[in-house]
Regions:
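N-terminal alpha-helical "arm" segments
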Residues: 1-36
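An N-terminal, globular interaction/scaffold subdomain
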Residues: 25-108
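Short, surface-exposed polybasic-aromatic patches that bind anionic ligands, especially phosphate groups
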Residues: 53, 169-172, 176, 185, ...
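Terminal, regulation- and interaction-focused segments at domain boundaries
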Residues: 62-74, 180-193
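Short, structured protein-protein interaction patches enriched in aromatics and acidic/basic residues
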Residues: 77-80, 96-119, 212-242
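Extracellular/lumenal glycan-associated surfaces
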Residues: 82-91, 194-210, 231
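Surface-exposed beta-loop interaction hotspot
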Residues: 123-187
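C-terminal structured domains
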Residues: 212, 218-285
Length: 285
């Protein structure tokens, strides 16, 4: 995973309103959706890694994990050849996640080209603590992290600042939906509202910083940051020229753009089965 793919996040990194530009239709980013069989043929690997893939494929054929759960196999003890083989097979899909954990470790998560399959690695410094391949709508570490932030109270409202236009009513709207799970998901689309920089600063102070950063690609790119409030996300979407398309606060456990759909998991299970069958047929006798 690239160490710099979050460099466009944060204040001052997005174009100002006077530089706003948008293509009539966003251009699709190219994402490979099939592993390169020619490349896999060149990768040395052991029966152990094939057994792990078969195990995960078998689990997926038996049941599809519900929201909040995953199926998983442990890759931590793979040798260098098997690790390279897995990297080649999985590739990089549309979603990348980085989570700063409370114990000072960091989880790096990359969706595979098989939608709903996630490579999950946790490190502390240079030490690799966990390496798993998970199948589910979202990785387990993300489900666990999104429940740890605060539930808000009115005492969290920051003091008003000069230049506020809609910041205060938007803050009350946001807090009301966070407190009521039945009112979620809810989106506050800043792009469609008259909003000042003071409003943005006020909402940012209300929500505070979070410990999760997500990048998705597809039609343009989306940069999503968890805030310090439970189930509140700040989302920015850009087109392929980095022009702004959307800025919003999303109030939900995990934004829908991050989740793999059930039908995606079914498709990935079928494709993984075909790859496992191909590997079995290609194995030397």
């Amino acid at each position: 995973m690239s160490e710099t793919f979050f460099h466009l996040l944060g204040p001052g990194t997005q174009p100002n309103d006077d530089s706003f530009s948008m293509n009539p239709l966003p251009i699709t980013c190219q994402v490979n959706d099939e592993p390169s069989m020619a490349a896999l043929e060149q990768c040395a690997h052991s029966p152990q890694v094939i057994a792990l893939l078969n195990e995960l494929q078998h689990q997926l054929s038996e049941r599809q994990p519900p929201l909040g759960e995953v199926l998983a196999v442990d890759l931590l003890n793979l040798n260098a050849d098997d690790r390279h083989f897995i990297n080649t097979l999985l590739g990089e899909g549309e979603v990348s996640v980085r989570i700063q954990q409370a114990d000072d470790s960091e989880s790096e998560i990359q969706e595979a080209i098989f939608c709903g399959l996630w490579r999950v690695r946790r490190r502390r410094g240079e030490k690799l603590l966990e390496d798993k391949l998970e199948a589910g709508c979202a990785p387990l570490a993300l489900w666990q992290a999104v429940t740890q932030n605060l539930l808000p109270t009115d005492s969290l409202l920051p003091p008003p600042i000069d230049g506020l236009m809609n910041g205060l009513p938007l803050a009350h709207e946001l807090l009301a939906h966070v407190r009521n799970p039945d009112a979620q998901p809810h989106s506050i689309n800043l792009t469609q509202l008259p909003i000042s920089e003071a409003d943005r600063l006020f909402l940012s102070r209300l929500c505070g910083p979070g410990n999760i950063q997500i990048r998705t690609i597809g039609y343009g790119e989306s940069y999503i940051k968890a805030t310090g409030l439970r189930h509140v996300w700040h989302l920015r979407c850009t087109d392929t020229l980095k022009g702004p398309l959307l800025e919003s606060y999303e109030i939900c456990p995990i934004p829908e753009v991050v989740l793999a759909a059930p039908e995606d998991l079914v498709d990935s299970a079928q494709r993984l089965s075909e790859v496992c069958q191909w590997l079995a047929e290609a194995a030397p006798t």
